[in-house]
Amino acid sequence: MSHKIVKIQPGANYTGTTVNFDRSVMQIQAMLEKHNCSRIAIQKDMRGELPTVTLLFEKANLPYIIEFPIIYEKRRNTPDKLRMDVSGRIIHDRIKALLIEVDLNILDFSQGMMAFLAIPDKTGRPEALQDYVLENKGQIASGTFDITYQLPSGRV
């Protein structure tokens, strides 16, 4: 799934952040390292019109993927302003909240991070489980979805 593009109003949550994007990413990486994640990688693609940033990591041989949303703050008389700092803080706070539940033994790591579990999409590229479920929610709701037919053979 491609990165989500969101337009927010001035004054919306997180628009007052003073933490830049790179600092948020470093803090997320530190949280993941504290939880013994491995192969942590940041993939930035600034070649196109829209900058995309993806965080990839593993824990207990399970791959995870987090795509940072592309957030623009609406402006009246000027072009909308790219706010990756807001994107970074939102993802930072979400990961922090999930890992607090892990620290308190409410969830184990794989439960807490299940939304970000990387599974192959129809082309074989990694996709977050939350996005995969969203794309297939009609089939899931109707009871016609069978993940065994969606995965490459031998991956069940």
PLM feature spans:
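Detector for methionine-enriched segments
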Residues: 1, 26, 31, 46, ...
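Terminal, regulation- and interaction-focused segments at domain boundaries
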Residues: 1-27
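Compact, well-ordered interaction domains used in eukaryotic information-processing assemblies
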Residues: 20-73
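Intrinsically disordered, low-complexity regulatory regions enriched in serine/threonine/proline
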Residues: 67, 72-156
